[in-house]
Amino acid sequence: MAHKKAGGSTRNGRDSNAQRLGVKRFGGESVLAGNIIVRQRGTKFHAGTNVGCGKDHTLFALTDGKVQFEVKGPKNRKYISIVAE
């Protein structure tokens, strides 16, 4: 008779859920106050005018308007602002 011994247990077989980070509203898009613009880890993007920053560095609109991306400053930082339509 053919016999097969029990296979050993494995230490694999786990995976974490995706964090769903990234830009949610792109340049030129209309947003309402409270809309999330970017979900990020750290400050890849910085808050400009009419944009708030949450404790997890999520950027969100403080007023209604259009999203505007800009690069400025000596360190070429990326800022996101909301401009009135």
Swiss-Prot record:
PROSITE patterns: RIBOSOMAL_L27. One of its GO terms (cellular component) is cytosolic large ribosomal subunit. Residues 9-19 have a biased composition (Polar residues). InterPro entries: Ribosomal_bL27, Ribosomal_bL27_CS. Pfam families: Ribosomal_L27. One of its GO terms (molecular function) is structural constituent of ribosome. Keywords: Ribonucleoprotein, Ribosomal protein. Residues 1-21 are annotated as: Disordered. GO terms for biological process: translation. Belongs to the bacterial ribosomal protein bL27 family. This is Large ribosomal subunit protein bL27. It comes from Pectobacterium carotovorum subsp. carotovorum (strain PC1).
